From Swiss-Prot:
Protein name, per record: Suppressor of Ty 6 homolog
PANTHER family with a match to the protein in the record: TRANSCRIPTION ELONGATION FACTOR SPT6
Gene3D superfamilies: Nucleic acid-binding proteins, RuvA domain 2-like, SH2 domain, Spt6, Death-like domain, Spt6, helix-hairpin-helix domain, Tex N-terminal region-like, YqgF/RNase H-like domain
Locus of motif Nuclear localization signal: 26-42
Keyword Ribonucleoprotein: no
Biased composition annotated in UniProt, kind: Acidic residues: 45-56, 67-76, 90-99, 166-176, 191-200, 209-238
GO cellular component: transcription elongation factor complex
Subunit structure: Interacts with glp-1 and lin-12.
Organism the protein comes from: Caenorhabditis elegans
């Protein structure tokens, strides 16, 4: 609050009031603030990230480690109070506050979406993301947008208008005598960009929109300090006095608070948005997660080398070879080694050139511009995908450099603090030049993570002191000693820091090698071990202190300390990381939920049991399926270094480091042997307990990120396939415009028909012109009905088809598209084709019109979108779907770009099953790259974008532009009569800066023919081509030279003539022209000249692949998408549709004899179904027409139909294991059966099936993973069978009907839970688990011990009722009340008497012998005599043990006794009460039991666990220890 007060005082000090008018305290406060402003503050550049360790982890780690922490707590409280006393004396900047928060473990809680790296207790979490620059960047992405949005309603705003204008209203409303409130009014919209109010009116559709309503009258500066206001009153003598009074602080509601932020964002009204729109820099450069920054030549050289290594050469942990092909450098693949290095140098040079184009501010070119207009500079070595990869990795390089500079600066400052301060603690581990160089030359975030982790361990506790030392040094205040005292105790209450504070580090230094020396010995033995002359425990004795109370604790602390330091050494981490990743394996096992959930349709069905699979064998996105299943609780995932064979041979990771004897002294003395053992424990602790868990989590995150990247790449590839083809281009001829009312020659007319999934809804057709605007539409109610359907369906279908014919005859489309909704589309396509053919046969249309099946997904997304509803509010959904489908057939790019809107409808496209499981920002990045490529390749008609809303979104993907610049540009166009006559007007009229214009000019095309019709101004013909304005003169020169006319000729006329006769360009020597340009200093421009020549031949020729209707496998995938996926080996439910027959030749039929059945009837030998009493009837049947009841032929199988409309064939041999002549003897028509898919033929849309029980039971073993865990699978199978059997038995057991308060139909487990909540005197009677003619009685003896016995029933009237006679042992009872009163309650009473006895052992059972004996000894020390102790038996309920010392040797004897309904049985004697048993025991305890007299061999004691199977020891068994 002091900081806020100080700022408020500054504001007030500049408000124009004199010092005399201020209160005295206020003047003193301002003077003090001015003094503080004179001091120089040092900015801490420490990491602005949260510290990963938390206090809870440290407390757990500290448990049992130190002797007493009371003093430490008191110190901590003292520190806290000391800190609060000085909190207002120093003003820290944000980074200093972040740094202190980091080291005090004060941080905001973040939602963790990733596996946390659990090794470190003091590393910063974001920087520890291993090998995931992508993910790290995602987490760092500028919160630019978010911050700008947060700034929407806040921030100080300057004055608005003059002072006199502001006081005008006060003057008018003044009533003379009333006090005047003379308060400055700060308008909330003072700093709003010009035109923001108009934009807001457009967005919200409110003509009288007033931005004043968005902001409070009183801004933050207005009285922030003391919340006062000035009131001017008459002093009675003609003068005025000013009175300061507390102002009304009641917060006023604003219009801003009632509007969703997203609604304001739609218009890009924020100041930050306007700044992006106006700045002369590509918008994507400004919005990049790490913005593009200026770089010098040395940095670009280093970056180019780094990019070729990590972007194009560095491999992945998992197998991503197939997906990485698009990003590989084709120019150096499969080259001969003799030329490889030279080509690689050329590629590095090209990459550096690309970086110069991106990062040198005088260029600022986007990758697309470089690919099209700077081909020669990159020697045509880099593809467009390569350029984008360079751009993306430039972002990672900038992010890495930013992190690196922060850590380097922090280490440099710490070293300065070590060298110049008087803090001896800081000098213990000086930072060397090598440490700084390691940081400076770190190449990956992993390396930086390791360096930072080591720094945080060694110097993290010194950061507070360093900051205060820096401030004290620069301000000249002598407060350093005070700071040192105040921060003497560590604020980091973790195990390592406790060791440091108590001097344990000195003992760790006597182990022979420091952690740094150990890491340097990994490659070769550079350092010899310095052997300490004392034994380890003897040396530890010297460091015993209150916190470490004995030598064992000291030695353990030293081992932990050195192990921690070893685990943080970057070289050690690098070594372990490489080893771990090379050999890591993983195991997959389904959970109980997974076993029930994962069926044959699940992608992990054949991968759900995995054993010891190498991580490197994972492919593409495979691991993301495992991760998703793990998150859903379906499987358990375990990653380990050792394979199953390694575990069997004890070949663990740590052994690789121990076997090299890095930390071993080669001597055989007792001292050396003990020290070697201690050193091995250190290494084992560092590797096994600290690094392996860390590396396991790090590897998990790494392969998870690789899987997510694979999904993103597959989404990009799928999306590219949808926009890489052009729309339908008809072959125009002279008959195309022979009808009145048709558009001009060459204009396309596209029709689309969409039918709904609900058959009772109407279908719609729509026709669009070449601009995608609706020309006409058609409603067909009965389009989906069948032509030969029953009832009136045929007539209704004909009505709809007649409407379709009339529409086509009138509008004459060039092509018709039909949506692929389900399998019905193939039938409906035939209907449309027949209708078109009928029109053509009647000469009603001049040529056949093609009908195409089309992917319907994008059209359905558009149909459901808010944009669709806003643009076509009066059209039904199916018509809107047809409109989108027609535009997709016209040109897919504008329609897909149309989905990239504020609602992000583009993400509704189904591109990959796992696309929802990756970060949407990552998905947006790869999809935007593809749209930028294709939009710029096709070119953007800017006037069409201004005229038609469905084209508008294309403009944002133009090179150099973005959503903000595109919006701003369109507003400028609308202000200029909605027309751009030339590219030059983008600069003159729309005020585009030179850099943005250079990027976008070549990709913005002007339809010169249409523009010429609308304006009399000069229209540059080259503006309609891909020729960039910077090379217009070369194009004109080429046209003049090709025509061989004088240079003084009109170049525009020459261009026109060349475009009409492009063949004349063939004779032009472009190579010579290129050489001339090179001599004139323009550089190599041969590729550019050839591109210009191509454009003059055909302006903006579509470079995409021509439109192609989906067929074969692609069509099958689109059709199968409408239902449940069917794959080979799957079991699917299908309905028998018909029997399939094979025709029999008539000549062969004459020679076939009918079969004679047992009933004497004759049966057809072919169809096996027709019978007749005479052979002639069979002959007539065989020769008859099958459509009129004749023989259909020999049945060969059945035709099956599935829910998704597909059909399959199951031959006779696959219907049953036995021979089948007639399928109808095994199956019935229209009945559902399960079938197994043996073969899937996507080209023919056919399935080859089997319904044999043997096939249905077997899994397709060929589909199983190579590392399938058969042993675990069989074990789980047996477990599932056992559980199923128990469940079946439970369901079949008769439910008992017994009216008694103690009876419950529950299991033993449920009964024990109920008894835990009941009184000790209660018991539960329940059905017996083994027999229906029996009951079980259960009661609780003590914690974990329950007695249970069987009651036999006889004389039962019903199986579910209770028997009239109950028997336990040899005793009979008439009913349950008698059983409880005579048998159960006496034993409960005696057991309660024992368990409440003062000498009863309550903390365990008698099987826990050591605990019982310890309790006996404690009682002896407490009572001063030999006691006896009771304990209950866990193994044998209803039996107890009495433990006692029977002689002076303090040996303890344990004897069992048993409670019975009539008392207690002990040493083969019965006693009525416990007191009588104890009286007898006290007289005879010194006598050995009978069993010990017979045998001197002590008996074994029971332990808590499973009940013993054999032998059975009698209740009176005794033994002693």
């Amino acid at each position: 609050m002091d900081f806020i007060d100080n700022q408020a005082e500054e504001s007030d000090a500049s408000s124009g009031h004199s010092d005399d008018e201020e209160p005295q305290s206020k003047k003193m406060k301002m003077a003090k603030e001015k003094s503080k402003r004179k001091k120089k503050m040092v900015a801490s550049s420490d990491e602005d990230e949260d510290d990963d360790d938390d206090e809870e982890e440290n407390r757990k780690e500290m448990q049992g480690f130190i002797a007493d922490d009371d003093d430490e707590e008191e110190d901590a409280k003292s520190e806290k109070s000391e800190k609060s006393r000085h909190s207002g004396e120093d003003e820290l900047d944000d980074e200093d506050l972040d740094l202190i928060n980091e080291n005090y473990d004060i941080r905001e809680t973040k939602k963790q979406n990733r596996v946390q790296l659990g090794d470190s207790s003091d590393e910063d979490e974001p920087i520890r993301r291993p090998n995931h620059e992508d993910d790290d960047l995602l987490s760092e992405r500028g919160s630019d947008d978010g911050d700008r949005r947060k700034d929407r309603g806040r921030g100080d705003r300057g004055g608005y208008g003059s002072e006199s204008e502001r006081s005008e209203d006060d003057f008018i409303e003044d009533d003379g005598d009333a006090p005047r409130r003379h308060r400055k009014r700060h308008r909330g919209d003072e700093n709003l960009p010009e035109g923001a109010e108009d934009d807001a009116r457009d967005v919200f559709g409110v003509e009288d929109f007033n931005l004043d309503e968005f902001y409070d009258d009183d801004d933050g500066e207005d009285g922030l300090e003391d919340e006062e206001e000035e009131i001017i009153e008459d002093d009675g003598e003609g003068g005025e006095i000013k009175i300061r009074r507390k102002k009304d602080t009641t917060k006023k509601s604003t219009l801003l608070e009632s509007i969703e932020p997203s609604e304001i964002d739609r218009g890009f009204l924020l100041p930050g948005d306007k700044k992006i729109a106006k700045e002369d820099l590509p918008e994507r450069f400004q919005l990049r997660r790490t913005p593009v920054t200026e770089a010098d030549d040395d940095e670009l050289e280093s970056e180019a080398l780094w990019i070729i290594k990590y972007a194009f050469e560095e491999g992945t942990v998992t197998n991503q070879a197939d997906l990485d092909q698009d990003d590989k450098l084709d120019c150096i693949m499969n080259l001969d080694p003799s030329v490889y290095e030279d080509r690689k140098k050329a590629v590095i040079k090209s990459i550096k050139k690309v970086l110069q184009f991106i990062r040198v501010r005088s260029n600022s070119f986007e990758p697309t511009f470089i690919g099209f207009y700077r081909k020669e500079d990159i020697d045509n070595l880099l593809t467009m995908n390569n350029l984008w990869r360079v751009y993306d990795f430039d972002e990672k390089w900038c992010h890495l450099s930013e992190k690196k500079n922060k850590i380097y600066d922090l280490m440099r400052r710490m070293r300065e603090y070590q060298e110049l301060s008087d803090d001896l603690t800081a000098k213990r581990r000086p930072i060397s030049d090598a440490d700084l160089m390691d940081t400076k030359y770190a190449e990956t975030l992993e390396q930086l993570t390791d360096i930072h982790a080591n720094f945080q361990l060694l110097y993290g506790a010194l950061l507070d002191d360093m900051i205060r030392w820096e401030k004290g040094r620069l301000t000249g205040e002598e407060e350093e000693q005070e700071y040192r005292v105040k921060f003497k105790s560590s604020i980091r209450n973790d195990k390592y820091q406790m060791c440091v504070e108590n001097g344990i580090g000195e003992l760790a230094g006597r182990f022979g090698l420091t952690a740094k020396q150990f890491s340097e010995n990994l490659n070769w033995k550079k350092h010899d071990i310095e052997q300490d002359p004392m034994l380890p425990l003897e040396a530890a004795e010297e460091y015993v202190c209150p916190a470490f109370s004995d030598s064992d604790m000291v030695l353990n602390g030293a081992k932990f300390m050195l192990a921690k330091e070893i685990s943080r050494q970057p070289q050690v981490r690098h070594s372990v990381r490489q080893e771990f990743r090379q050999s890591a394996h993983f195991w997959i096992k389904p959970t109980k939920k997974g076993r029930d959930t994962i069926d044959q349709t699940h992608p992990l069905y054949d991968k759900r049991y995995i054993k010891s699979k190498p991580v490197r064998s994972l492919t593409a996105e495979e691991f993301l399926f495992y991760h998703k299943a793990k998150e859903d609780g379906l499987v358990d995932v375990l990653i380990m270094y050792e394979s199953e064979e390694d575990q069997d041979s004890n070949n663990y990771l740590v052994n690789k480091y121990l076997s090299d004897s890095i930390f071993q002294k080669d001597e055989y003395t007792e001292n050396v042997e003990q020290w070697n053992s201690v050193r091995d424990e250190c290494v084992n602790m560092a590797i096994t307990e600290m690094l392996v868990p860390y590396m396991r989590d790090e590897l998990y995150n790494t392969i998870l990120e690789e899987a997510k990247t694979a999904v993103a790449k597959k989404c990009r590839k799928e999306f590219a396939s949808r926009i890489s083809r052009s729309g339908y281009l008809p072959d125009f001829d002279n008959n195309d415009d022979d009808d009145d009312g048709m558009d001009q020659h060459g204009a396309r007319r596209i029709m689309a028909v969409c039918y709904p999934t609900e058959r009772d809804e109407a279908s719609f057709g729509v026709m669009v012109d070449e601009n995608g605007a609706i020309v006409d539409y058609l409603r067909m109610v009965h389009f989906t009905k069948r032509t030969f359907g029953g009832g009136n369906n045929g007539l209704r279908k004909a009505e709809s088809m007649d409407l379709f014919k009339k529409f086509v005859q009138r509008r004459k489309p060039h092509a018709i598209g039909l949506n692929i909704e389900d399998m019905e589309c193939t039938r409906l396509k035939r209907d449309l084709e027949e209708a078109v053919a009928d029109l053509f046969s009647q000469n009603l249309i001049y040529k056949p019109i093609p009908v195409f099946l089309m992917d319907n997904e994008a059209a359905k997304v558009y149909m459901r979108s808010n944009v669709s509803l806003a643009e076509n509010p009066d059209h039904p959904p199916t018509l809107r779907q047809a409109l989108s489908l027609a535009r997709l057939l016209l040109d897919p790019i504008p329609e897909y770009a149309h989905l990239w809107n504020i609602d992000e409808d583009i993400f509704c496209l189904s591109l990959h099953p796992l696309q929802r499981d990756i970060d949407q920002e990552q998905l947006a990045l790869v999809l935007s790259h593809e749209l930028v490529n294709k939009v710029n390749e096709e070119g953007v008609d800017i006037n069409k974008c201004a005229e038609f809303p469905h084209y508008t979104n294309m403009l944002q993907f133009t090179c150099g532009l973005g959503p903000r610049k595109a919006t701003d540009l369109l507003k400028s166009i609308k202000a200029n009569d909605n027309l751009i006559e030339s590219r030059s007007k983008l600069v003159v009229g729309c005020k585009l800066g030179p850099k943005v214009f250079m990027n976008c000019a070549g990709f913005i095309k002007i339809d010169t023919i249409k523009v010429s019709e609308k304006t009399d101004a000069y229209v540059e013909v080259l503006d309609g081509s891909r020729v960039h304005p910077e090379t217009y003169e070369w194009a004109r020169k080429m046209a003049v030279d090709a025509l061989e006319v004088d240079d003084s000729a009109d170049p525009t006329a020459a261009l026109q003539e060349i475009m009409e006769s492009p063949d004349r360009l063939r004779d032009l020597d472009l190579d010579a022209f290129a050489d001339e340009l090179s001599r004139q200093g323009f550089g190599e421009k041969k590729s550019t000249l050839y591109d210009i020549s191509s454009e003059l031949s055909a302006r903006y020729k579509d470079l995409r692949q021509p439109f192609q209707e989906p067929t074969g496998e692609l069509l099958y995938d689109l059709l199968a998408r409408s239902g449940k996926e069917i794959r080979e080996g799957a079991k699917v439910l299908g309905t028998v549709q018909s029997v399939q027959y094979r025709k029999v030749d008539k000549d062969a039929a004459d020679s076939m004899l009918p079969d004679v059945g047992e009933d004497g009837l004759f049966t057809c030998p072919c169809c096996k179904s027709f019978t007749s009493s005479a052979p002639g009837g069979i002959q007539e049947h065989m020769l008859g027409d099958s459509r009129q009841g004749g023989c259909p032929g020999t049945p060969v199988g059945i035709r099956v139909r599935f829910d998704n409309g597909m059909t399959g064939f199951c031959p006779n041999k696959n219907i049953s294991s036995s021979h089948v002549d007639n399928p109808l003897t095994r199956v019935k028509i229209n009945q559902p059966y399960y079938f197994k898919v043996l073969k899937l033929d996507k080209e023919r849309f056919s399935l080859f099936l089997s319904c044999k029980s043997s096939d249905l039971k077997e899994d397709d073993l060929s589909q199983r993973d190579q590392y399938w865990d058969e042993h675990q699978y069989q074990a789980d199978l047996e477990l599932m069978k056992s559980e199923s059997k128990k469940k079946t038995e439970a369901n079949t057991r008769v439910k008992r009907v017994i009216a008694h308060p103690n009876f419950h139909n529950v299991s033993y487990e449920a009964a024990t839970k109920m008894l835990d909540e009941m009184d000790w005197s209660e018991c539960i009677i329940r059905p017996s688990a083994n027999k229906d003619s029996g009951l079980s009685v259960t009661w609780k003896i003590c914690d974990r011990v329950y007695h249970n016995f069987f009651v036999k029933e006889s004389a039962k009237d019903q199986v579910f009722s209770i028997g009239r006679q109950l028997s336990v042992g040899g005793e009979d009872f008439e009913d349950l009340d008698e059983l409880i009163a005579r048998f159960v309650q006496p034993m409960i009473q005696i057991s309660h008497e024992i368990t409440t006895h003062k000498y009863f052992f309550p903390n365990g059972t008698c099987e826990e012998t050591e605990a019982v004996e310890q309790f006996v000894r404690e009682k002896k020390r407490e009572l001063g005599r030999s006691p006896y102790v009771f304990s209950a038996s866990y193994r044998q309920p209803c039996q107890f043990c009495i433990s006692y010392m029977f002689d002076n040797t303090e040996r303890i004897r344990h004897e069992y006794f048993k409670i019975v309904p009539h008392g207690v049985r002990f040493r083969h004697q019965n006693f009525d009460t416990l007191d009588r048993m104890m009286a007898w025991f006290k007289r005879h305890f010194h006598e050995p039991p009978i069993e010990l007299r017979r045998s001197a061999i002590p008996a074994p004691q029971y332990r808590v666990g499973a009940p013993p199977a054999a032998p059975y020891y009698p209740p009176q068994f005794v033994g002693y220890h």
